[in-house]
Amino acid sequence: MKPVVALVGRPNVGKSTLFNRITRSRNALVDDFPGVTRDRHYVDAVWNERPFTLVDTGGFLLSDDDFFAREIRGHVELAIEDADIVALVLDGRAGISPFDRDLADILRRTSKPVFFLVNKVENHKQREELLEFYSLGIEKFYPMSAEHGIGVEPFLDDMVALFPAPEPVVEPQAGSEQGEPDASEQEICIAVAGRPNVGKSSLINRLFGKSRVVVSHVPGTTRDSVDLSIERNGRRFRLIDTAGIRRKGKVRERIEKYSILKSLKSLDQCDVALILIDADEGVTDQDITIAGYAQDRGCGALFLINKWDLLDEDRKDQRRFMEDLRTKSKFLSFAPAMTISALTGFRTHKILAMVEKIHAQYAYRINTGLLNRIVEDAIFRSEPPMHKGKRLKFFYATQVAVKPPTIVCFVNYPDAVHFSYHRYLVNQIREMAELEHTPIRLLFRAKTGKIDFSGKSKLAERIVEKKEKKTTRRKKERKEQSRRKRVRDLKG
């Protein structure tokens, strides 16, 4: 198991900047506003070929005056408890604060290795003014500038030197093959999205079985997208608790704008979006806007109607609620919906099973022969409209990607395919391939140059052949009906 390293410290000392520097990413939001990071971020990193998990925590405050201070302090304590190594980040510009002294005292009492990092030290003149940090009762500290990457390497070298010896790597035997994992083995990435204060963080904590993200009645508690991993029944899930997405007119703080951009980026990266809706408030325009973001990004989707337990019996009309949801979200007709309560756990145990079902379809590849038979049958049942007096001709279809299933149909006039016929073909593929819970992308391309049909279904030829057989059969039927009529007339 990889060692866990926790970055702790008071707000705005540069923990998130250091986190991003070490992980070579922009996973944590960075701003001059204190308290930006309110939750823990877990990201895998590597230094000198030694892998470890780095944890970025919220700013640690010893005071209980503020609700978030209490919650964040609890998260830091959990991070320290989970960590193998703790790094206390201090501010070289601001100097030592009473909070730094209290936190240093707490960390000295732990049996775990503790590194003291003095951040925001950009030049030698500043280094000469750092003697006061020895008053914390420490033997060694690491002056650095996380923003400019100065002095970070010595800390990382000493840190990985404390890691247990790496396990020997077993080389694969000659002749063995390692293919791409199938859908049942892949980690499923889930984004928990919704308006502020609909219960996203409460749901994450319910699925994990312990407090992982700050929960509050105050809208906008989660300002950053928080990545967490969980394993259930041998299957790994990566859950992203996104910042609440408000209407544009209500987004005022600069840091909140950053958070919303990260939430939208999380939808880009996820396999399945859990779209939370507040049952007490009903389906709002903003809920549908968020659902639209998920549709635009092509991820799977699952509607979760949260706080169902808060409704009185007169309002618990699930059929009416679902009808309203389906009417307003016709573009996500494939997305299933469930009523839940993140607070009490009502039906939450069914969520990950449904996510697995959605993901299996989201990552599904349709056999080319079956796909062409489905399209062939759909065209035979309902012919495409004419284009400038000429019939649209479909040559063949092939699936070019998964997540979501993406299909290309080669036709003679791709721009002439009407949106209603496009929708008809998607619905036929969804029904016949049993992909009722995943988005499907259907693209039309022109057949250019010579195409080798070997090994492919000659769709156009078979459609013409079917039509000719149908025409011949109808001629025979009409001829037989005419013959029988003449016989009846002669007998009459």
Curated annotation (Swiss-Prot):
Positions of region (Disordered) = 464-492
Function, as annotated, reads: GTPase that plays an essential role in the late steps of ribosome biogenesis.
In this chain the KH-like domain maps to 364-448
What is the protein's species of origin? Desulforapulum autotrophicum (strain ATCC 43914 / DSM 3382 / VKM B-1955 / HRM2)
Which residues are listed for GTP 2 binding in this entry?
194-201, 241-245, 306-309
* Pfam families given in the database record: KH_dom-like, MMR_HSR1
The Swiss-Prot or TrEMBL record describes its family as follows: Belongs to the TRAFAC class TrmE-Era-EngA-EngB-Septin-like GTPase superfamily. EngA (Der) GTPase family.
PROSITE patterns linked to this entry = G_ENGA
Q: What is this protein called?
A: GTPase Der
The record describes its quaternary structure and partners as: Associates with the 50S ribosomal subunit.
Q: Name one GO molecular function term.
A: GTP binding
